[in-house]
C-alpha cells in the first residue's frame, strides 16, 4: 500500500505462494475468480504511486512476480511496465487475449443496425420463434433483499445445472464449495449496491440468466447460463438482445464488459475490445531472473507441443483412413 500522509493513494494486493519450488508473489485468486488490481487513487498522479509500489516489490528479491488478467492499456499498468524497465527488471507478457465491450448508447436502432446483417437476421428469427411459442420477457433484478439474493442466485445455479456443464462436472452445483463462494460474493456485491441479476423468462419461468456487478456505469458479466432443453430457442442470444435493449432504455451510457476470452458469439455484439494477459516480472535477484528466462523460453515450446497433440489424429482414426 502507498500512503500520502494519512491518505491511502495506491496499492497492489498480493499473496506469497510457491510452484515447482519457485517463490511467487501473485494476486489472490482461486479457480473461479481472479482478484487484486493495481490501484491508484483518481485524485493523485499515477507515476509516483506506481514507482513506490515497484520500489516496494523490489525488496522481495527471491520472488518472481506473476500478474494475471492485466489490462495492459490502462495507465497504471503501462506506468508499471515503464517503472520495471527503469530499475532494469526483466519481464514477459504471456497469454494475451481480447475481451469484448458492448456500448449501446441511447439509440437502440443505431446500435442494432451497426451489427452484421447475418447476426441481425439471426436475432430477429430467434425472437420471432420464441414469441410464437410462449410469452417472452426479461427480468432485471437490482436492490435485492438478502433473502431474494439467495433465492434468485439458487435459481441461477439450477438453470446452469440444466446445461452441458452438469455432465462435464463444471457447473456451480457440481463443484464443491462453489455455491457458497458465489453466494458470499453476491452478498458483498449486494451490500455495495453492485449486484444485478438478469433472467430470460418464458411464460414467467426463468430459462437463462446472467450474474453481473454494476459499478461506475460498467456492467461486468461474471456468469451466464441457460437451460439446455430450450437450446432450440437460442436463449443466450435472446437474453443478450433484450438486456442491451433494456440498458439502452433504462441506463443509457452503460457499458457491458463481457469478461473472459472474446469468443465468436460475444464478438458479434461487441463494439470494442481490450487486451488482457499474464505479466511475469523478476525485479531483483539472480535466481528469479534465471527462472523467468527459462519460463519465457519453455512456455512457447510447451504450448506448441500441446497444440500438436490436440490436432494430431488418434491411432484409431489414422487406421480407419
Task: Describe the residue ranges of each PLM region.
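A conserved beta-strand-loop-helix scaffold within acyl/acetyltransferase catalytic domains
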Residues: 1-30, 66-232, 319-321
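A structural detector for beta-sheet-dominated domains
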Residues: 41, 103-105, 282
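A general structural signal for short secondary-structure boundary/capping elements
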Residues: 57-60, 115, 145, 204, ...
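Residue-level detector of flexible, active-site-proximal loop/helix-junction positions
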Residues: 145, 263, 283-286
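Short alpha-helix boundary/capping motifs
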Residues: 184, 275, 293-295
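C-terminal structured domain segments across diverse proteins
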Residues: 187-200, 205, 209-212, 239-247, ...
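Membrane-proximal basic amphipathic "stem/tether" segments
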Residues: 280-321
Amino acid at each position: 500500500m502507498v500512503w500520502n500522509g494519512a491518505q491511502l493513494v495506491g496499492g497492489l494486493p498480493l499473496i506469497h505462494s510457491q510452484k515447482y519450488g519457485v517463490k511467487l508473489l501473485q494476486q489472490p485468486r482461486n479457480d473461479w475468480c481472479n482478484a487484486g488490481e493495481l490501484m491508484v487513487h483518481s485524485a493523485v498522479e499515477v507515476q509516483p504511486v506506481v514507482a513506490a509500489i515497484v520500489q516496494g516489490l523490489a525488496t522481495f528479491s527471491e520472488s518472481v512476480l506473476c500478474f494475471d488478467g492485466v489490462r495492459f492499456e490502462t495507465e497504471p499498468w503501462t506506468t508499471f511496465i515503464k517503472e520495471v524497465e527503469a530499475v532494469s527488471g526483466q519481464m514477459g507478457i504471456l497469454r494475451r487475449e481480447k475481451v469484448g465491450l458492448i456500448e449501446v448508447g441511447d439509440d437502440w436502432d443505431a446500435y442494432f443496425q451497426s451489427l452484421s446483417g447475418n447476426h441481425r437476421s439471426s436475432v430477429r428469427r430467434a425472437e420471432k420463434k420464441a414469441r410464437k411459442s410462449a410469452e417472452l420477457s426479461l427480468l432485471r433484478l437490482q436492490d435485492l433483499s438478502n433473502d431474494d439474493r439467495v433465492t434468485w442466485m439458487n435459481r441461477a445455479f439450477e438453470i446452469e445445472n440444466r446445461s452441458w456443464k452438469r455432465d462435464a462436472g463444471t457447473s456451480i452445483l457440481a463443484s464443491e464449495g462453489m455455491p457458497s463462494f458465489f453466494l458470499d460474493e453476491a452478498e458483498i456485491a449486494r451490500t455495495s449496491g453492485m449486484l444485478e441479476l438478469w433472467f430470460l423468462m418464458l411464460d414467467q419461468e426463468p430459462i437463462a440468466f446472467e450474474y453481473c456487478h454494476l459499478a461506475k456505469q460498467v456492467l461486468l458479466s461474471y456468469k451466464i447460463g441457460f437451460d439446455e432443453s430450450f437450446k432450440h430457442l437460442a436463449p443466450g442470444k435472446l437474453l443478450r438482445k433484450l438486456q442491451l435493449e433494456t440498458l439502452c432504455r433504462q441506463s443509457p451510457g452503460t457499458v457491458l464488459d463481457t469478461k473472459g476470452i472474446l469468443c465468436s458469439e460475444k464478438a458479434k455484439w461487441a463494439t470494442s475490445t481490450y487486451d488482457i494477459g499474464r505479466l511475469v516480472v523478476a525485479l531483483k535477484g539472480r535466481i528469479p531472473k534465471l527462472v523467468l528466462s527459462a519460463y519465457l523460453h519453455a512456455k512457447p515450446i510447451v504450448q506448441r507441443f500441446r497444440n500438436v497433440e490436440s490436432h494430431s489424429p488418434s491411432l484409431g482414426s489414422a487406421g480407419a483412413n
